[in-house]
């Protein structure tokens, strides 16, 4: 029987898999762009932030591209969170995914052989009232062992005033945590919530300038306010 291809797996597909959901620290001894101290910090805290990827003159046309893509998406009836796997459709997104500084950071954290398998344009519209509850990316991804990371590139300035992402430092050492389906009253962009997440470590706001990036482990608890 021919199987249906899905870029984003269904929750039932993932729940039925046997997976190694432990944090596997970076063992890179000769990093390309990160310092040994940054590697140590990633292993300890589960993330790095304020990594300069693009200069102002480079990020401006990328922002313009995404503004146009967003307008086309909204005009088609989709919402601002629906632009997923865009690297398969748009050369600009592919160029970002394969941008040498981004690939070098991924290799320093994950090892020399990396696959950029996904992309998601995550855009909060002013006043939409949606939050992102505390969650772990590993809950959504069919990867084993758990050696996957997310690189977030800011195409505009992200700070507490516009609900930047927040990480819970060190929470990746807890393994895969129990989650529950999010309630409608949470107005969650996603569909999972880890309760009492603050008990697993310090909350760190990830404020980025346009052109900067962060990287975090797929087991790190993170979310953002409305």
For each of these PLM feature ranges, what is it?
Residues 67, 73, 156, 187-190:
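Juxtamembrane helix-loop transition sites at the ends of transmembrane segments
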Residues 21-22, 160-225:
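Double-stranded beta-helix
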Residues 112, 138, 153-164, 170-172:
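Active-site region of the double-stranded beta-helix
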Residues 137-139, 156, 221-225:
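Short beta-turn/strand-loop junction motif enriched in small, turn-promoting residues
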Residues 135, 142-160, 207-210, 215:
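Short, conserved beta-strand element in jelly-roll/cupin
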Residues 51-52, 118, 153, 169, ...:
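Pocket-edge structural micro-motifs
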Residues 1-45, 50-143, 179-180:
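Non-heme Fe(II)-dependent double-stranded beta-helix
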């Amino acid at each position: 029987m021919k199987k249906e291809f899905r870029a984003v797996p269904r929750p039932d597909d993932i729940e039925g898999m046997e997976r190694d959901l432990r944090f596997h620290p970076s063992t890179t001894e000769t990093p390309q762009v990160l310092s040994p101290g940054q590697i140590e910090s990633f292993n300890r805290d589960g993330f790095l932030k304020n990594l300069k990827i693009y200069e102002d003159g480079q990020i401006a046309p990328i922002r313009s591209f995404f503004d146009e893509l967003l307008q086309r998406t909204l005009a088609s009836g989709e919402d601002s969170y629906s632009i997923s796997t865009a690297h398969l459709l748009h050369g600009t997104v592919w160029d970002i995914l394969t941008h040498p500084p981004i690939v070098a950071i991924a290799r320093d954290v994950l090892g020399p052989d990396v696959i950029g398998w996904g992309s998601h344009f995550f855009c909060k519209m002013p006043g939409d009232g949606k939050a992102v509850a505390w969650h772990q990316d590993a809950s959504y991804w069919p990867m084993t062992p758990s050696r996957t990371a997310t690189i977030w590139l800011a195409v505009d300035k992200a700070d507490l005033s516009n609900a930047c992402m927040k990480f819970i430092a060190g929470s990746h050492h807890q393994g895969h945590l129990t989650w529950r389906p999010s309630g409608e009253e949470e107005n969650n962009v996603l569909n999972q919530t880890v309760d009492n997440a603050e008990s697993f470590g310090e909350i760190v706001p990830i404020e980025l300038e346009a052109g900067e990036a962060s990287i975090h482990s797929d087991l790190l608890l993170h979310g953002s306010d409305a």
